[in-house]
């Protein structure tokens, strides 16, 4: 039961954070680029057993690596909102990630849904899917602050990948 709660909490957080990290796509970029990313966003007020809505922000330090029409490594920041998030049932999120690769900045607005696919251990306890006008991908989330039992999850590590449309 505890494992399921932690997984759902992670999924909720992943959704919130995944939208930011995965949703960034270079405007006008040619399709055919595949990217991987990771980041550690903060959730406020956090996710618990009670349904909550809030915001997520990435304090920086996230990385992205792309191959294809857009190729290279860089960093990103993101922010957004999450809704109806609980440790046991996921939720949804929206975010506006921004990536900079080789001096070029890319942005997109993405919608995230937690729990549509099974988690991929050891990357995360929860998997979310996300899609924007320019990108489509998945993110695996793992709580790094909070456990959804004695305290809400207020930070998660997200690791994912996306394809540019």
Regions found by a protein language model. Name each.
Residues 1-26:
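Secretory targeting and sorting signals
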Residues 9, 13-14, 35, 154-156:
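A short, structural micro-pattern
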Residues 9-10, 25-27, 104, 109, ...:
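Compositionally biased, intrinsically disordered low-complexity segments
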Residues 27-45:
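Short N-terminal segments immediately surrounding and downstream of signal-peptide cleavage
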Residues 33, 64, 84-85, 145-147:
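Extracellular secreted precursors and ectodomains with disulfide-bonded cysteine-rich loops/domains
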Residues 41-134:
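Predominantly extracellular/secreted and cell-surface proteins with exposed
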Residues 131-165:
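Extracellularly exposed regions in secreted/surface proteins, prominently low-complexity, repeat-rich
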């Amino acid at each position: 039961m505890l494992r399921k709660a932690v997984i759902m909490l992670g999924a909720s957080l992943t959704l919130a954070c995944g939208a930011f990290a995965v949703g960034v796509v270079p405007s006008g970029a040619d399709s055919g680029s595949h990217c991987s990313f990771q980041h550690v966003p903060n959730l406020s007020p956090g996710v618990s057993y009670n349904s909550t809505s809030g915001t997520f922000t990435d304090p920086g330090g996230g990385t992205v690596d792309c191959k294809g029409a857009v190729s290279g490594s860089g960093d990103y920041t993101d922010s957004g909102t999450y809704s109806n998030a609980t440790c046991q049932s996921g939720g949804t999120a929206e975010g506006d990630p921004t990536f900079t690769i080789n001096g070029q900045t890319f942005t997109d607005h993405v919608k995230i849904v937690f729990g549509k696919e099974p988690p991929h251990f050891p990357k995360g306890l929860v998997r979310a899917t996300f899609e924007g006008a320019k990108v489509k991908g998945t993110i695996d989330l793992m709580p790094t602050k909070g456990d959804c039992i004695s305290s809400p999850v207020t930070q998660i590590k997200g690791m994912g990948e996306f394809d540019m449309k």
